[in-house]
Amino acid sequence: MWTYRCKIKKVVDGDTVDVDIDLGFGIWQMNERVRIMGIDTPESRTRDKIEKKFGLAAKAKLKSLLGPNPVLQTTISKKGEDMKGKFGRVLGDFLIEGKQVTEIMCKTGHAVPYFGGSKADTQKQHMKNRKKLVAEGVVKGAIE
């Protein structure tokens, strides 16, 4: 694991962020897409209107945690020489005041733990999270 400072450019969805990574000594890796490793969030870019509401809530939560465009730390996992996942994104997690974003997103019901495999396995937890977010008033108008 390596830790880098980075600057948030854009929150794409609840588990994907575009960043500039400070490699040190004034060297920056620009415009990298980071997949937050270890979680799955509802899709915000989908035709399913109900899922989209929860996906947009996850995106908003992540954006509020990271701030508008701050410099943060991100821990990037590296298997061998491969720092990127199957879709070419850097795999990592962000640290906010010493806490991992993955933990916060799961605790608040905006994400579920996910380490590959079938997304069908995570669906039960997503449904529990939906009920929690509706009950707390985080997501409104989500009728199933």
Feature map (PLM): residue ranges:
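Small beta-barrel nucleic-acid-binding modules, primarily SNase/OB-fold domains
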Residues: 1-144
